[in-house]
């Protein structure tokens, strides 16, 4: 739809394996909506959750591939050879998740006891952006074209509210910078840039934990200043970039000045 309207949408679909086990005997006829709480298995990049009595009382095991995430070309969404019932439900290859699934059986043996429901299991699709944030707001390219994309379950209600507030009031109650679709420059909407950054972000959805300012490795040196080579000679630390421009945060050539100024730098105990 974005392509037809002339609106670039900087995101990549990502396959998300969803395996179902059960049903849970405890859920049959139970008054409680849920029997078990959600378990997040950080070390295995996976989670286990109770789907609820109204959804068959199954246990859902979801996995985030942290080594070779399987991005899906937008043109391939809806490929009848790869989908089952819905464009966002793709066939699951059990071999792709065999190793983490074995670990899950050790951590949560109830999965093995209940048994795998093959017919209900599939690869879902998630949306991942170049900076792992959602895309909310009016398109900079086409007036009146609004987006609320790359929104995951836990963020759905809040993102919907922000989008509605933007439409009705022209502003929101919170700072929209990290969600606003307009935060991306044209170069950051190019397909290869989006794909490489989305792949990198997909590797760290659950594990390993990364610092919010962790520098990106992919799609670097797109733009450099005329004095970039000189900055490198001075030992520039190009740990980050701004709008695709390389920017040095510090210079090794200034290291000798620590003796003079270190005493003026406050000590942070925490």
Segments predicted by a language model, with ranges:
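A short alpha-helix-loop-beta-strand transition element characteristic
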Residues: 8-12, 170-176, 237-239
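C-terminal catalytic lobe of FAD-dependent flavoproteins
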Residues: 43, 71-74, 83-208
């Amino acid at each position: 739809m974005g392509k037809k309207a002339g609106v670039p949408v900087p995101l990549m679909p990502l396959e998300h394996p969803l395996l179902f086990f059960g049903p849970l005997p405890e859920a049959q006829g139970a008054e409680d909506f849920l029997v078990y709480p959600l378990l997040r298995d950080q070390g295995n990049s996976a989670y286990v959750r109770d789907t609820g009595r109204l959804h068959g009382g199954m246990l859902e095991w979801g996995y985030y591939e942290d080594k070779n995430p399987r991005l899906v070309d937008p043109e391939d969404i809806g490929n009848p050879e790869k989908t089952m019932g819905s464009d966002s439900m793709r066939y699951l290859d059990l071999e792709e998740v065999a190793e983490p699934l074995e670990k899950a059986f050790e951590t949560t043996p109830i999965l093995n006891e209940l048994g795998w429901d093959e017919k209900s299991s599939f690869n879902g699709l998630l949306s991942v952006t170049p900076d792992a944030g959602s895309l909310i707001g009016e398109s900079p390219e086409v007036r009146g074209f609004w987006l609320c994309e790359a929104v995951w379950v836990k963020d759905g209600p809040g993102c919907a509210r922000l989008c509605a507030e933007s439409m009705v009031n022209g502003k929101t109650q919170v700072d929209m910078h990290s969600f606003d679709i307009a935060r991306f420059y044209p170069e950051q909407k190019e397909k290869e840039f989006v794909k490489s950054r989305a792949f990198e972000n997909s590797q760290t959805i659950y594990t390993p934990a990364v610092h919010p300012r962790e520098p990106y490795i992919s799609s670097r040196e797109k733009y450099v200043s005329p004095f970039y080579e000189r900055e490198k000679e001075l030992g520039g630390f190009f740990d980050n970039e701004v709008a695709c421009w390389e920017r040095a945060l510090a210079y090794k050539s200034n290291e000798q000045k620590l003796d003079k100024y270190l005493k003026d730098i406050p000590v942070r105990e925490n």
